[in-house]
């Protein structure tokens, strides 16, 4: 897969009322708000534009101090981050063919090369959306519901995403929780690329049963019959920050750099 740089913009959905870590975007990481860390990582990619989409004035005010980062004040009724970014795309006035990379607001260590790679993957595929995955080699990750797993077809497209360990090894997991060489098991990296036009189509899709059960917005795309291209990336993506424990680990990782 070519990793040539293609034009793209980065949009970061950010909401204050995260259930597992309230006020997450403004939590301090290395003495600075988490949203600052994520936005500056986006700026380092060479993106044409970087936007933060939020419905909270506290987040908007925090981002306003960052040079080169735009803020879109969005409605507080959106069901998912992608719905929020669709409104951001309208506010920004992006043409339908503009490649939009959805960088989650809890990914302060996302490698710039990986962000560029997901844009390139969309450009070179016939899928409606592109995303990244990395292999799982730790049992604690495989069975952690906060780490999303996925399975792909032989064409490198997603078949399903789940918080459960998929595929389930019927013979092995009955007696042990250790991954086996029959994998690889894949961890989904919460990084997406699609064009601005598809973002608008996404808002017309009704959340399906699978999305509601798993609480995973990408399942809406699959349930509606669209395709998601997947690249297994060699770049190291630390897990996102979802809990106070994750934040403590991120703080330690920052200190060790």
Curated annotation (Swiss-Prot):
Biological classification of the source: Bacteria, Pseudomonadati, Pseudomonadota, Gammaproteobacteria, Lysobacterales
Enzyme class: transferase
NCBIfam families: kdsB (TIGR00466), PRK05450.1-5 (NF003952)
SUPFAM superfamilies (alphabetical): Nucleotide-diphospho-sugar transferases
Gene giving rise to this polypeptide: kdsB
EC number: 2.7.7.38
Family to which the UniProt record says this protein belongs: Belongs to the KdsB family.
Catalytic activity: 3-deoxy-alpha-D-manno-oct-2-ulosonate + CTP = CMP-3-deoxy-beta-D-manno-octulosonate + diphosphate
Protein name: 3-deoxy-manno-octulosonate cytidylyltransferase
InterPro entries found in the cross-reference section: Cytidylyl_trans (IPR003329), KdsB (IPR004528), Nucleotide-diphossugar_trans (IPR029044)
An example Gene Ontology biological process: CMP-keto-3-deoxy-D-manno-octulosonic acid biosynthetic process
This protein's UniProt keywords: Cytoplasm, Lipopolysaccharide biosynthesis, Nucleotidyltransferase, Transferase
Main location: cytoplasm
PANTHER family to which the protein is assigned, alphabetical: 3-DEOXY-MANNO-OCTULOSONATE CYTIDYLYLTRANSFERASE (PTHR42866), 3-DEOXY-MANNO-OCTULOSONATE CYTIDYLYLTRANSFERASE, MITOCHONDRIAL (PTHR42866:SF2)
Highest rank taxon of the organism: Bacteria
UniProt xrefs under HAMAP family: KdsB
Signal sequence extent: none
Role noted for this protein: Activates KDO (a required 8-carbon sugar) for incorporation into bacterial lipopolysaccharide in Gram-negative bacteria.
